[in-house]
Amino acid sequence: MSKPLRIVFAGTPDFAAQHLAALLSSEHEVIAVYTQPDRPAGRGKKLTASPVKTIALEHNIPVYQPENFKSDEAKQALADLNADIMVVVAYGLLLPQAVLDTPKLGCINVHGSILPRWRGAAPIQRSIWAGDAETGVTIMQMDIGLDTGDMLKIATLPIDASDTSATMYDKLAKLGPVALVECLADIAAGTAIAIKQDDERANYAKKLSKEEARINWQDDAEHIERCVRAFNPWPMSHFEVAENSIKVWQSRVEASSHDAPAGTILKADKSGIYIATGHGCLVLEQIQIPGKKAMPVQDVLNARAAWFEVGSVLS
């Protein structure tokens, strides 16, 4: 049996916390945790600890929360830990080369896509947005580039037709910890194999924006439907009607032809709101009007039928 690793863990949100929890149940020793500084949250804007910090404190693990690693003090504090390896999961801080070089075995990262397909900030969302058949997690040896390091392990799973970014996030948060523990076992045993990425196959998964999430009815229905799922739970696909912003939580593509201008409401009843697009028809099934929770279209039509008159054209 190989010797347990002395691990420094760096991460911030719940996705990272689930990986930390797996490490705490493994043979390895988590000697310290790095996480983002406490941030104001909630209506009272009270300083709130990250999910990773919460778990670390529950297990009496030392917590470090530097704003960055520019100072000699921050770099020395990491060096003093004498870690074998640093595991980075959705940390949110850029790590300079000096930090990457500090642990004996360097730093590894759990990335939410099959590299090199989607590098960057929003790989889960972009995989749905692009219509990929599968996604997964890649564990890589970190280098100074953006998700360009050598790959140590890949675990995959299919993207179902009903998957949203929220459901994929949950699935990857279960897949990632298992892959991480398996990868660390290989590293500890000296059997891990590093595979270089093919840069020619790489795409940049840029951050999402509210502007991008505004529906363009000139797009084809299949693309809009993928956007609805990719942008759930944020920033939410939306459109304007009667000067109100309507968020779309669930939709489907109707395989029917039409010659109506894009944005035309073709039908509105309990089965959905049928809207002409640049190619095909999109059926809205669950939407959210201002001040209300998401609800089935039938409930919205009972109260706001005038907003969705057949023949009217959405901008």
Curated annotation (Swiss-Prot):
Residues that, per the record, bind (6S)-5,6,7,8-tetrahydrofolate: S113, I114, L115, P116
Molecular function, one GO term: methionyl-tRNA formyltransferase activity
Reactions that this protein is recorded to catalyse: L-methionyl-tRNA(fMet) + (6R)-10-formyltetrahydrofolate = N-formyl-L-methionyl-tRNA(fMet) + (6S)-5,6,7,8-tetrahydrofolate + H(+)
Classification via Gene3D superfamilies: Formyl transferase, C-terminal domain, Formyl transferase, N-terminal domain
Pfam families attached to this UniProt entry: Formyl_trans_C, Formyl_trans_N
Alphabetical UniProt keywords: Protein biosynthesis, Transferase
InterPro entries associated with the record: Fmt (IPR005794), Formyl_trans_C (IPR005793), Formyl_trans_C_sf (IPR037022), Formyl_transf_N (IPR002376), Formyl_transf_N_sf (IPR036477), Formyl_transferase-like_C_sf (IPR011034), GART_AS (IPR001555), Met-tRNA-FMT_C (IPR044135)
Gene Ontology cellular component list: cytosol
Domain of life: Bacteria
UniProt KW Disulfide bond keyword: no
Protein biosynthesis among keywords: yes
Documented EC number(s): 2.1.2.9
Record family assignment: Belongs to the Fmt family.
Protein purpose: Attaches a formyl group to the free amino group of methionyl-tRNA(fMet). The formyl group appears to play a dual role in the initiator identity of N-formylmethionyl-tRNA by promoting its recognition by IF2 and preventing the misappropriation of this tRNA by the elongation apparatus.
Protein name (Swiss-Prot/TrEMBL): Methionyl-tRNA formyltransferase
Organism from which the protein derives: Vibrio vulnificus (strain YJ016)
Lineage: Bacteria, Pseudomonadati, Pseudomonadota, Gammaproteobacteria, Vibrionales
Gene expressing this chain: fmt
